[in-house]
Amino acid sequence: MANIKSAKKRAVQSEKRRKHNASRRSMVRTFIKKVYAAIAAGDKDAAQKAFNEMQPIVDRQSCKGLIHKNKAARHKSNLVAQINAMQ
């Protein structure tokens, strides 16, 4: 454990940020899973709706640095391709 006052403060701030980021990361993963679940169920309308809900959230979190922008782009690209491939 830190002895210096500023180091203690940084440890508290770091833990607070870790919890906040974990919550946001979990939310992003949940929205992505909803799209994959709709695709697996074969429901194109539900998949499109879930994707439209997921896209701005993923973009917002990638702009804030929670996930890398290339990872966000990769998720969106793969999901759009799978939705378009559905009958």
From Swiss-Prot:
GO terms for biological process: translation. Pfam families: Ribosomal_S20p. GO terms for cellular component: cytosol; small ribosomal subunit. Keywords: Ribonucleoprotein, Ribosomal protein, RNA-binding, rRNA-binding. The keyword Cell inner membrane does not apply. The keyword Ribonucleoprotein applies. GO terms for molecular function: small ribosomal subunit rRNA binding; structural constituent of ribosome. SUPFAM superfamilies: Ribosomal protein S20 (SSF46992). It comes from the Bacteria. InterPro entries: Ribosomal_bS20, Ribosomal_bS20_sf. Residues 1-25 are annotated as: Disordered. Belongs to the bacterial ribosomal protein bS20 family. Binds directly to 16S ribosomal RNA. This is Small ribosomal subunit protein bS20. It comes from Yersinia pestis. The gene is rpsT.
